[in-house]
């Protein structure tokens, strides 16, 4: 992040102007760092709220925040941790899960006990087999890695043919990755997978990437950043219609007709939404990263009924219910109070939910969750479905680079377009696709590059 010591923009006759499109974590992080450097910043957000794909709900469980979007934070997410410390946000570590009591459902068969404990262990061995390739990857610029083009040309499915382990272990590993990376394995770049593993610290990627939740809800970080930026610099309900880069100053036109001029424009909205933007000169296709599909189903139950059967709420399947865990912060004080069983599905599993009506989704949830956690349908009280690909200003889960895109698209995103349009967000963060860290980190890094471009500040390396 940018250091406090800086050459103030006041030394310039006129401070540079930057318009940032999107008030998700990427946009807010970039705006906050640029404001500290003395840049005149305007953040435009189409929605009536801050946070983008981070949305903390307080209506499902009493006195708790439940995440309808991005949820888990890693010990290997330095920007998130730095902001949490700076703004006084408490992070709670998730309890360890006992593999023997965390069900896996594969090929229609529910596994428990010693069989599932052995499968969890074997699954881990399969995943760790990619670490050797990941150690060769340049974390900041994976397209410069040895054999980058060849690794990028491979799909994850092709690379998986070299995995060790039994067929069942490989199937479980692929189910986990397909959900986590919201990807279809045959359409997901192997280099993108390796870049994520490398960015997370190789071995640490598997053990430290999803271990914390924010006690006050992840959206509290968005609010903290917004307060630091200043309310006057953020405009909600302000969708952008066009970006014109042909003159000396960039011009951003809102749907309302308002026109803003800027020395630079930062686009943080996901690439899946760019069809709604008219960019002049037109943005080449090689700037657009592929995105995947992800959904969440938040199920309020009358109490954590699974404990009576000595089950953990963490599960993995090869069906529509991709993965489950217990949601809600702060942690429960009583075993009798209502709880949230969260379903997360990515890739093909997510599509199964999106293709159904609300009534069909409820039926699907009851059917599959009753298999994993017998009695679920008797205990469920409320269900909230969040289909991010159906949300107007999102249209996706998160980035899922196709074969060839890491070496082709990422260098272009890092370089910008027409020397005026720049990019930040998880889609522009090769080490943290799909994570909040991707937005926060890419926003802060871009702010540093722009500050140097404007001759404003030095950069403090995290």
Q: Predicted segment positions?
A:
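FAD-dinucleotide binding site
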Residues: 1-462
